[in-house]
Amino acid sequence: GIFAGSGVGKSTLLGMLARGSEADRIVIGLVGERGREVKEFLINCLGEAGFARSVVVVATSDRPAAQRVCAAWTATAIAEAYRDDGHNVLLLLDSVTRFAFAQRELGLAAGEPPTTRGYPPSVFNMLPRLVERSGRTSKGSITAFYTVLVEGDDHNEPVADTLRGLLDGHIMLSRALAEESHWPPIDVLQSLSRLQPHLVSQEVGQSVVAARQHLSEYRRHADLIAIGAYRNGSDPRVDAAIAMREPLRNFLVQDARQVADLSASQSELIRLVRTPAGT
């Protein structure tokens, strides 16, 4: 799941994923987006190369709630059909929150009782049914990214909270990083992957842990560092975190038009955390 407030860059990140994907097929579901945003995504974010190898299902915000709900199921069904044909599929659904909004409209209109923040029970029944349809079978696979629009940057609102328990990975986009022109604005410390130990080597896993420790140490002492109250040499861990700050930031920043090689990125991360003072 890609969790983000409005205007933080989730559409740009989806376009980067689509253009850089090595999947056999790409299926994109755009649910509840404005018509202008759909056009901008297809032209600017997805691009000609990405669009040429993608199936796009769209139900804009002005369409009836039933049609918006149907768009999410349709995109998922198309991905399943490709998977059953033996393909590895990338499914991008933007956004599962607006799918939940549409189902809320239908549920309330049907007379369901509102529960948490006005959501009827059918919303929380449909969310697991939707996301559980992705994954690997004996024939192929569906790797799915679901964007979650966090209302008011509240990551504990009901839809986001439910999806955190359903999804294997959480990519948290930070408004503060976006304001610093840190693109993509992924908050590494808030993000996690439950499957990471099964997907990367032990060496890469240890490098990830080391990098996160440096970032965490710097964040804990950021106020002291900013006002000049921290004295170099007071704590070796903080000294290392300060030295690694810029190298790690440069590693995490990526131009939207750039496609990074996974093996090269892993090797670069290993080199960074092994090099004294990040030099």
Question: Regions from the language model: what does each represent?
Answer:
Residues G1-T279:
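P-loop NTPase catalytic core
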